[in-house]
Amino acid sequence: MSEHVRTRSQSSERGNDQESSQPVGSVIVQEPTEEKRQEEEPPTDNQGIAPSGEIENEGAPAVQGPDMEAFQQELALLKIEDEPGDGPDVREGIMPTFDLTKVLEAGDAQP
């Protein structure tokens, strides 16, 4: 039996100082087992159906056709108006309150 030994000088003579990215030995590719496939795939039978049997709408309804751009603009406006803290109670707090008696008295006063 003869032993073949590769030396560093042989690889540098070829101009290939980098080690090969090819794996040495055999590579075994394992397919996922049936149990793992079932865990990875979400159930498709009852997606979007609530326990009560009603269909849940996630997000905005699908709109197709020429009205798509108008729908997207309207949806953008609704999102802006529905920002947290923009409810009617907040708007009332921002509006100034006037004491009508003081306003009327100020209007009747003469310089």
Swiss-Prot record:
List residues, modification Phosphothreonine: T97
Q: Which InterPro entries match?
A: GAGE, GAGE_fam
Q: Where is this region: Disordered?
A: 1-67
Which Pfam families does this chain map to? GAGE
**Does the keyword Phosphoprotein belong to this entry?**
yes
What are the alphabetically sorted keywords of the record? Answer: Phosphoprotein
* Compositional bias segments (type: Polar residues): 8-24
Q: Which domain of life is it from?
A: Eukaryota
Tell me the SMART domains matching this sequence: GAGE
Q: Give the UniProt family note.
A: Belongs to the GAGE family.
Annotated protein name in UniProt: Putative G antigen family E member 3
The beginning of the lineage is:
Eukaryota, Metazoa, Chordata, Craniata, Vertebrata
The record's gene field reads PAGE2B
